């Protein structure tokens, strides 16, 4: 666990300075330096530890652990599993990302209702999310593994095509699509660099750096959360957790990151 708590205090202390920093190349450099400084003691480790405990603990009406959950590489295999997700699962006859697969395992193995399994998908500062902890634990087991999301099954190809369509679909009060904010290099909103997600390098870096511990929120955030929040920025209706649309969009982004080593849980401002 190293000095996570001390690092957390440091991060909080650094935050106001960051908010006041002027936009410009200097800011980007500062944020990068600050990321580097925190990289050896990411508070995400606290979520990982809690997630490991949740994975192993007997829970739900059936009082069994998740250790027999098949994330795609065989029952209980966690190492490298995230680097090949989303993918098609024959037992559910659909494409699933990590979260929808975990919900599936909570329902089938542990006997939870869907409502219980999807309760509080994202933490809110005072109440932590079990789902985000599980995601932190499992994704950490793919650190360094090269992304290799499959397009073998017809439903995997369908999900990719649907995700691509959603990415370029314009609508809402501002007539925005994801591409409006994410298809040009060098764009920035306030202090934040906007990755060009249609360009391989940016797409790889963006996808492989989630989940991330968000210093500004004191929370670990998953890719499902990232997409939920970008739907909000786009003034679209709320993206339903583990919905077909969220999985398809994840498939599009994850597949476009193929070839890059997975590098999360990361740390972000
Ligand atoms: C109104 C502009 C806007 C729209 C539209 C938008 N985003 Fe974003 N997106 C952002 C901003 C701003 C950030 C950076 C947020 C931050 O750093 O806090 C971001 C970050 C991201 C990231 C993480 C990048 C990284 O390197 O960490 C991903 C992935 C992403 N958006 C995907 C999407 C997808 C998919 C859509 C369409 C559903 C979308 N965005 C729509 C503004 C937008």
Would you name each region that the model predicts?
Residues 134-141, 150-151:
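Hydrophobic, well-structured mid-protein blocks that either form specific transmembrane helices
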Residues 22-46, 56-133, 143-144, 169-269:
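Electron-transfer interface patches adjacent to heme c in soluble/periplasmic c-type cytochromes
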Residues 17-21:
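Sec/Tat signal peptide C-region and signal peptidase I cleavage site
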């Amino acid at each position: 666990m190293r000095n996570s708590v001390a690092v957390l205090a440091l991060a909080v202390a650094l935050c106001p300075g960051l908010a006041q920093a002027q936009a410009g190349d200097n800011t980007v450099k500062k944020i990068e330096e600050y990321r580097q400084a925190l990289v050896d003691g990411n508070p995400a480790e606290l979520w990982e530890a809690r997630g490991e405990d949740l994975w192993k603990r007997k829970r739900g009406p059936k009082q069994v652990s998740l250790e027999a959950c098949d994330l795609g590489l065989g029952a209980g295999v966690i190492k490298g599993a995230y680097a090949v997700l989303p993918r098609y699962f024959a037992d559910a006859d659909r494409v699933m990302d990590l979260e929808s697969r975990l919900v599936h395992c909570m329902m089938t193995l542990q006997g939870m209702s869907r409502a219980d399994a999807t309760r509080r998908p994202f933490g809110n500062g005072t109440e932590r999310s079990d789902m985000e902890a599980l995601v932190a634990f499992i994704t950490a087991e793919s650190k360094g593994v090269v992304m290799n999301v499959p397009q073998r099954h017809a439903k995997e190809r369908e999900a990719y095509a649907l995700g691509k369509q959603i990415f370029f679909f314009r609508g809402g009060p501002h007539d925005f699509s994801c591409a409006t904010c994410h298809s040009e290099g060098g764009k920035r909103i306030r202090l934040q660099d906007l990755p060009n997600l249609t360009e391989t390098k940016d797409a790889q870096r963006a996808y492989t750096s989630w989940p991330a511990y968000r210093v500004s929120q004191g929370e670990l955030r998953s890719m499902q959360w990232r997409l939920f929040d970008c739907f909000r920025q786009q003034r679209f209706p709320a993206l339903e957790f583990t919905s077909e649309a969220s999985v398809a969009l994840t498939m599009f982004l994850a597949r476009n990151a193929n070839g890059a080593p997975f590098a999360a849980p990361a740390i972000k401002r």
